[in-house]
């Protein structure tokens, strides 16, 4: 979280998002999961279909994400959603930050052949996310995601273990 989400929130976040989310990331109070991959999309991230329709001060989400690591532990998700189908696929993507306890979100475990549970499919059924949860501009989430990936894919791999706060270790065991 500190390595990838914090820099992106610092760069694209509103003053309110920075004031609320950055201290929670630093303290480990929030556990984040990533809502990128979708069923049937393979490695083509821009082909995502999780639909987000603007309704007043909210986006209404319908669809699903898959291979979502630790969604069953997370209380927040950073998520790419489809807000427009016009133009190139990358131009109709919006980056949202959302609460995993929002009504309409269902986390379904994916068990490995060894019986382990690390991955999940996450379903969104009429999930309302406030517009204030948007990071960056509507339909410019591709830019935000690329920025995040520069941090996520850089640096020593051992730092990735810092993204799960110590408070979650009891739940894992």
Task: Cite the ranges covered by each PLM segment.
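Conserved small/polar residues in nucleotide/adenosyl-binding loops
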Residues: 1-4, 160-166
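Buried hydrophobic positions in well-ordered alpha/beta secondary-structure cores of metabolic enzymes
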Residues: 14, 34, 61-63, 96, ...
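A short, Trp-centered hydrophobic/proline-enriched beta-strand micro-motif
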Residues: 28-36
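A structural signal for short hydrophobic beta-strand segments in well-ordered beta-sheet cores
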Residues: 50-53
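A short core secondary-structure module
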Residues: 62-108
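A glycine-rich, basic-preceded beta-loop-alpha segment at the flavin cofactor/substrate interface
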Residues: 108, 113, 120-162
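Hydrophobic alpha-helical segments, chiefly the membrane-spanning helices
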Residues: 171-173
